[in-house]
């Protein structure tokens, strides 16, 4: 985005994809547990546009307490995302570097998302979400 909040034309496709994903999350929000803090995992989070947007939707717009973990292979990207999260004082957001197969969440996720995961990461994300019996997988 530009300083005035305009989406750059080179990023308009990604912007539309993330907004569509947020529509999906909004549509299934009632299927997520309402009696506790939601546990969310974003596999292959990359620069975490979806991770931050999901947090905003759940925590700020839907007023649903949530704890979100973004996982990605690239340590440099994870460090940048963690820095941004810390600067924004988003304590319920955390980022980890690693492989999907080696990730162990603090508690079973209610929502697992994965947008454009590379190689076999989409298959790995689906398999892991099913194994954890996540309420919703997108």
Describe each PLM feature range.
Residues 36-46:
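Conserved class I S-adenosyl-L-methionine
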Residues 47-63:
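Conserved SAM-binding loop of SAM-dependent methyltransferases across substrates and taxa
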Residues 101, 110-122:
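A short SAM/SAH-binding and catalytic strip from SAM-dependent methyltransferases
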Residues 119-131:
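A short, conserved alpha-helix within the catalytic core of class I
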Residues 133-138:
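Conserved beta-strand signature within the Rossmann-like core of class I S-adenosyl-L-methionine
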């Amino acid at each position: 985005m530009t300083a005035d909040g305009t989406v750059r034309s080179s990023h308009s496709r990604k912007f539309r994809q993330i907004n569509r994903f947020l529509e999906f999350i909004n549509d299934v929000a009632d299927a997520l547990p309402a009696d506790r803090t939601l546990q969310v995992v974003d596999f292959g989070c990359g620069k975490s546009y979806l991770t931050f947007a999901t947090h905003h939707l759940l925590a700020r717009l839907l007023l649903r307490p949530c704890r979100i973990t973004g996982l990605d292979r690239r340590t440099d990207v994870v460090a940048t995302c963690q820095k941004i999260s810390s600067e924004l004082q988003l304590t319920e957001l955390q980022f980890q570097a690693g492989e999907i197969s080696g990730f162990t969440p603090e508690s079973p996720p209610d929502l697992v998302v994965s947008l454009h995961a590379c190689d076999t990461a989409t298959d790995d994300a689906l398999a892991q979400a099913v194994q954890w019996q996540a309420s919703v997988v997108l």
